[in-house]
């Protein structure tokens, strides 16, 4: 009778262990789908153009975001965190488009949501364009999305880590880095938002070909307006 009780207890413990393991595996698999990701609300031109931005430098000044694209359109990176090595990798990749963007007459800008110490200064070597401060984080909305501990169990995040590490990019942990960033290609005047990429997980970059294709539409629109 005693042996039977021991066997039942052992079987029960094994069942609990197997069940817990199965639940953990199922949780990890589910975490690698888009089910738990923050929902994205697309920005509108009206929402973005009245955003108050600030220049970064010795004599900062305030201006409306629409000044960035009013005449020639713009490609704008909303940086999750300047010290993040994944963001630096993305900025470096985006900067490879600068010669083509210059030919199209389309400027390249970056937006940060905070300016801590020398973080923007240390980010600048990776980004071939001007950087501005969006203190209210408008470019990260209308619905700000965060990635918390979920990022640690997503295979895509670890693949992005590995890619950036292999590329030789380094960073730090200074500043807020949970609110996800994105990328915008905005046409001149009231042409509108031609491309909007929202980072769905750490290191989720915009497709550079899509960015350049959208920028070419700005060039055509500007040329038509000038004729």
Swiss-Prot record:
Keywords: Antioxidant, Cytoplasm, Redox-active center. It comes from the Eukaryota. The keyword Metal-binding does not apply. The keyword Iron-sulfur does not apply. Pfam families: AhpC-TSA_2. The active site is at 84 (redox-active), 87 (redox-active). It is found in: Cytoplasm. GO terms for molecular function: antioxidant activity. Residues 13-111 are annotated as: Thioredoxin fold. Belongs to the peroxiredoxin-like PRXL2 family. PRXL2A subfamily. The active site cysteines correspond to the redox-active cysteines of peroxiredoxins. Involved in redox regulation of the cell. Acts as an antioxidant. This is Peroxiredoxin-like 2A. It comes from Xenopus laevis (African clawed frog). The gene is prxl2a.
